Amino acid sequence: MCLRELDLNGLRIKTPAIVASLGADAERVASRAESEGADIIEVRLDLLADPDVIRDIRSTVSLPLIATNRIASEGGSFRGSEERRISILRDASRFSDIIDIELMAPGRDMLLKNISCPALISYHDFSGVPDNLKSIIEDAMRAGADLVKIAVTPHSMQEALAILRILLDVDCPLCIIGMGAVGRHLRAVAPLYGSLLTYGYVTGPTAPGQMSVRELDTALRCLGAR
């Protein structure tokens, strides 16, 4: 499989790309992520004691940065007001290449109006796989997504297969992730079907079923996707 290049408003990324999702120890391990095979770094602002750390990370790594301040209802740790959460993301956009905002976030449209970098609009379901995934993807694109991220939790191989079929059927910049025990293999396999990104960890998982960056790099190389 040949790498494809994704162009997000001038930001060029070779795909499938491995995103290192970094939490509380982001500043300490950011430089290590690249050496282990990451192509992009996600800074989970909701897991940081001080979200301003992202500016220090920006000065120490050359990889593109995704800023995420995950809302509690979608698996995140941010506990403040939505206004404050959006304000943190807006400030972080000055040091980021991509901003992640949830499709269902009350402050989504306000944020999108106030950032100039590409927007990754995300949707998470930690309990299953909704029947209307295609509609959710379409809603995200209509909302202004430059890239759509869908993270769902299949409970059977049939559901996992249905997720892969969506990657073949939908024509938009899309990342699909399988969470949980049944969905774990999709983190390595979905890129073969067109998922542009896959997320891994450096020191510890930030989502159910997440593999390490090193494991993903090895798996994708074995499968001919890198």
Curated annotation (Swiss-Prot):
Catalytic residue positions: 124, 149
Residues the record lists as binding 3-dehydroquinate: 21, 42-44, 70, 187, 206, 210
Top EC class, one word: lyase
A single GO BP: amino acid biosynthetic process
Pathway noted in the entry: Metabolic intermediate biosynthesis; chorismate biosynthesis; chorismate from D-erythrose 4-phosphate and phosphoenolpyruvate: step 3/7
Top-level division of the source organism's lineage: Archaea
EC number per UniProt: 4.2.1.10
Signal peptide: none
GO molecular function annotation: 3-dehydroquinate dehydratase activity
Reactions catalysed, as given in the entry: 3-dehydroquinate = 3-dehydroshikimate + H2O
Keywords carried by this UniProt record: Amino-acid biosynthesis, Aromatic amino acid biosynthesis, Lyase, Schiff base
Role according to the record: Involved in the third step of the chorismate pathway, which leads to the biosynthesis of aromatic amino acids. Catalyzes the cis-dehydration of 3-dehydroquinate (DHQ) and introduces the first double bond of the aromatic ring to yield 3-dehydroshikimate.
Oligomer status and interactors: Homodimer.
Family per record: Belongs to the type-I 3-dehydroquinase family.
Name under which the protein is recorded: 3-dehydroquinate dehydratase
Organism from which the protein derives: Methanothrix thermoacetophila (strain DSM 6194 / JCM 14653 / NBRC 101360 / PT)
